A protein has these predicted regions:
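N-terminal Rossmann NAD(P)H-binding glycine-rich loop of SDR-like oxidoreductase domains
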Residues: 2-26
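Mid/C-terminal beta-alpha module of Rossmann-like enzyme folds, strongest
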Residues: 3, 217-285, 302, 307-308
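NAD(P)H-binding glycine-rich loop region in Rossmannoid oxidoreductase-like domains
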Residues: 35-96
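Conserved Rossmann-fold NAD(P)-dependent oxidoreductase catalytic core, especially the SDR/UDP-sugar
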Residues: 74, 78, 83-143
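A conserved pocket-lining segment of Rossmann-fold NAD(P)-dependent short-chain dehydrogenase/reductase
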Residues: 83-84, 138-142, 181-182, 188-209, ...
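Active-site Tyr-X1-5-Lys
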Residues: 141-168
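Glycine/proline-rich active-site loop of Rossmann-fold NAD(P)-dependent oxidoreductases
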Residues: 162-166, 177-189, 221-231, 254
Length: 312
């Protein structure tokens, strides 16, 4: 069970998973789409993993990397909130790419698969802010990323039922913490905050979890033979105002905002950003993101991961 593949190993979660696996004595084959790009491989080379080139949208590249492996950590996915063609650039790679990886693993006889999903496939909170659990699904979402993660996970479970693949799913909230080599939609807001680029505090509550804890959840799921199903990973849900206050306490010299933005102001900004995107600029905020995330309670029940996996 010690020979594993980690897809998307140059990303924040993928790298953190690969790093922990190496520390626990695993033989790790880490996949990247372009093994000739030092930006994608230098940090992996330092771990001492085997680097393999594979593209989830090209099934012929996946078969060789699955050969002789005991397990797969299917982490690779598109993490973007906006694209000019969301179906082609976000949705299809997540859904089709994920199934391609699972199919290649099944064909190669890989014993167990840990599939990285997200709480984007779960939702934000129940009625009156009640915590959501693994029983909840974000099926009504039309946000490109949330829709892609929800549908990709549904397809993964359908394939596992049809094929008999031993599948477990990890559903983390927004992943922060060290060991990212480029910013993600989860870390970028903190870069803006620390640079003094936020003029108002957005009306949003973040579900947060450290990348190292997410990696631990993945590895525990793989190693816990009785584990089944989905597992939500969230350390805490904090309103943006509390996060800003924490930054202010840590370093009072950072020019953090002091006033909260009204939801109507954020909606207006998203519309303006959408208008600008028609002229070639990537928007910092979209109306779909506002509808999906802002002005809503956020709460998750993580008792299953703690009870079943011994997580954190």
């Amino acid at each position: 069970m010690k020979r594993v593949v980690v897809t998307g190993a140059n990303g924040h979660v993928g790298y953190s998973v690969a790093k922990l696996l190496v520390a626990r004595g695993y033989d790790v084959r880490a996949t990247v789409r372009d093994a000739s790009d030092p930006a994608k491989t230098t940090h992996l080379e330092a771990l001492g993993v085997e680097i393999a080139q594979a593209d989830l949208m090209r099934p012929e590249t996946l078969a060789p990397v699955m050969e002789g492996r005991d397990g797969l950590f299917q982490v690779a996915a598109v993490y973007r909130s906006w694209a000019r063609d969301p179906q082609r650039e976000i949705i299809e790679p997540s859904i089709t790419g994920g199934i391609n990886a699972l199919r290649a693993a099944h064909t190669a006889g890989v014993g167990r698969v840990v599939f990285t999903s997200s709480t984007a496939a779960v939702g934000r909170a129940g009625p009156d802010g009640a915590p959501l659990s693994e029983a909840d699904w974000n099926d009504a979402s039309r946000h490109p990323y949330s829709y892609a993660k929800t549908e990709a996970e549904h397809r993964a479970w359908a394939f596992a039922e049809e094929s008999g693949l031993d599948l477990l799913v990890i559903n983390p909230t927004a992943v922060i913490g060290p060991d990212f080599h480029r910013h993600t939609p989860s870390t970028a807001p903190y870069r803006m905050l620390l640079r003094g680029e936020l003029r108002r505090i957005p009306p949003i509550t973040y579900g947060l979890v450290d990348a190292r804890d997410v990696a631990q959840g993945h590895v525990l799921a793989y190693e816990t033979r009785q584990a089944r199903g989905r597992h939500i990973l969230c350390t805490e849900c904090l309103p943006a105002a509390e996060l800003v206050a924490l930054v202010r306490d840590i370093d009072p010299t950072i020019a953090v905002p002091t006033r909260q933005a009204a939801l109507w102001q954020v909606r207006a900004l998203a519309r303006l950003e959408q208008f600008r995107s028609w002229f070639g600029r990537e928007p910092r905020l979209t109306p779909e993101t506002v509808r999906e995330y802002l002005g809503k309670p956020t709460s998750y029940d993580t008792s299953k991961a703690r009870r079943e996996l011994g997580w954190c």
